[in-house]
């Protein structure tokens, strides 16, 4: 599947089917790119290619699975579901309609990748619960929603930490979010701690950049 591809060598040795066992990590657009590459190579070599890919999260790397088979005409005759284990029996000599694109859209794939990555990171590192800060903004809201989906709302504690820079709306938004998600929450104000930090560092109360210092 690359410039230094070994398919010529195995075909010269008499191979009827090429099986490519991979740990190909996910990134945006990778599933379609992989399909196109496998289909092109199968048609070029006039041999079926079975592309078997690892699925699961490993620290910061996510493997999407999405294994596939291209026949000698370059048609994708099997496209496994992405981000989940998949077992299938396939007859290579039976013509089937092209299955390309069965894994769904790119936004859905990114969503599945994030959920799988969080779930496997927690499981493989031996923890079942998580604590995260909730500001009421878009970033922490998205993280909380993904964590609830990956680990279950009963395993998530959201901590709201109002500071001198927090608005009343951000707290209300955070409280509404945890009600909708069904997870546990706590409010731990940090205004007093922030003042202590300013005094210890002999800083005047900042204007610009104060939010970052509070964080």
Predicted regions and their residues:
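Alpha-helix boundary/capping detector
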Residues: 140, 148, 203-204
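Conserved acidic
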Residues: 102-110, 166, 209-210, 214
